[in-house]
């Protein structure tokens, strides 16, 4: 079986990072193991009913030692994501949408 644990691991104005941990368990032996981890980012947007609303997400208050460790590195991960986003934008400028089997001369 698997058990999925998630918690908000950082916020910045209108975005939040969520940490996901998947723990597997061998049902015959009861042995547990770390099956997967990941970070996902969500961006909050104003409601279409109230597009002018200005809001900011509340700060994260980690409780356990694990949460404190993971939350303490949020800003580093955020900066890495922003840098990677810029690198990806630059990289994608060199890619085409041509279909080689259609758009290439024979």
Give the predicted meaning of each segment.
Residues 1-6:
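Functionalized membrane-embedded alpha-helices
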Residues 7-106:
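HotDog/MaoC-like acyl-thioester-processing domains
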């Amino acid at each position: 079986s698997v058990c999925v644990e998630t918690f908000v691991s950082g916020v910045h104005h209108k975005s939040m990072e969520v940490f996901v941990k998947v723990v597997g368990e061998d049902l015959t032996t009861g042995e547990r193991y770390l099956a997967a981890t990941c970070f996902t980012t969500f961006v909050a947007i104003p409601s279409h009913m109230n597009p002018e609303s200005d809001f900011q997400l509340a700060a994260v208050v980690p409780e356990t030692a694990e949460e404190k460790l993971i939350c303490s590195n949020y800003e580093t991960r955020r900066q890495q994501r922003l840098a990677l986003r810029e690198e990806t934008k630059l990289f994608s400028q060199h890619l085409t949408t041509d279909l080689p089997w259609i758009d290439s001369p024979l």
